[in-house]
Design a protein with these regions (language model features):
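Glycine- (often His-adjacent) and acidic-residue-rich active-site loop
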Residues: 78-115, 164, 247
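Short, active-site-adjacent cap segments at secondary-structure transitions
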Residues: 80-85, 134-136, 240-243
Length: 277
């Protein structure tokens, strides 16, 4: 089930320029500054990994912007040390999945693709501010955003193949659109990692800044976008997405089934066992 966010306070934009906290759960918070929403994901710990419950929280955060006509831009960020190392393979929910019926397993494996669609479907531009490692599911989530601002501390990779997992969440066609087929092959199949400068050269990162400055740079970009006519921005984003990503969901339709097959494989079980020792 989708996590129920705890609403701390909600102020109308006309009454306060800064809405201190519009939504807060244990790991995900949304702060409003006029028409800009800043979503912070901070689980604590070195990996900032995503459990299944946290994936639901992140999806709920994205869906909270539906019908928000005051919204002009969204900034998504992790901690000041790491964006995210991806899925938490030590999540005990994996053990429960083994006991589910096949239909329930397929339904459960929809969480990742649903998270990707929720962020890709936000009607206003989304800027991802990245410090430190952005790996696996972190890379997938970042690929759903419209812009990526990376600090010099950022590094990008997708070690899924090393743990016998597919690359899902509808992210493969997004990566291909951003960096091309061969760079996608290298990062997914050959274990290549990118520095911030390499990500900028390939087209994954739109801006590179000094370490610790990603959120500031992303907010500067958000301020610029928020100053443009909101309706025009929304229409142009929709035009771009319709042209660039028209077949994304068709070409990644088997994401959740591939994910399910991966979870049931002996190779994945062996790889996961190393995380839960």
């Amino acid at each position: 089930m989708r996590a129920r966010p705890e609403t701390v306070c909600r102020l109308e934009p006309s009454r306060a320029k800064v809405q201190r906290v519009a939504m807060k759960t244990q790991t995900v918070s949304i702060a409003r500054e006029g028409g800009i929403a800043i979503v912070t994901y901070d689980r604590g710990g070195r990996a900032n990994a995503m459990s299944f419950a946290i994936m639901d929280e992140l999806a709920a955060a994205a869906l909270s912007f539906v019908d928000d006509n005051e919204l002009r831009c969204v900034v998504l960020t992790g901690t000041d040390r790491i964006f995210s190392a991806g899925m938490d393979l030590s999540d005990p929910v994996f053990d429960q999945i083994n006991e589910m019926s096949l239909q329930d397993k397929r339904h459960f494996s929809e969480r990742g693709p649903r998270l990707g669609r929720a962020w890709a479907g936000i009607e206003v531009p989304v800027i991802c501010a990245i410090e430190g490692p952005c790996l696996a599911g972190g890379l997938a989530l970042a690929s759903m955003c419209d812009f990526r601002v990376a600090s010099q501390s950022a590094r990008f990779g997708a070690p899924e193949v090393q743990v016998a997992h597919n690359m899902g969440w509808h992210s493969v066609p997004r990566l291909i659109a951003l960096v091309g087929v061969q760079a996608t092959r290298r990062v997914l199949l050959a274990g290549e990692e990118w520095t911030a400068d390499e990500a900028r050269r390939l087209g994954f990162a739109d801006e590179v800044c000094e370490a610790g400055g990603a959120l500031t740079a992303a907010r500067r970009m958000a301020d610029r976008i928020a100053g443009y006519p909101g309706l025009a921005v929304r229409m142009i984003k929709r035009q771009i997405d319709a042209s660039a990503h028209a077949l994304d969901y068709a070409t990644s339709a088997y994401d959740k089934d591939q994910q399910l097959v991966a979870w049931m494989s002996e190779d994945f079980q062996a790889a996961r066992a190393k995380f839960v020792r």
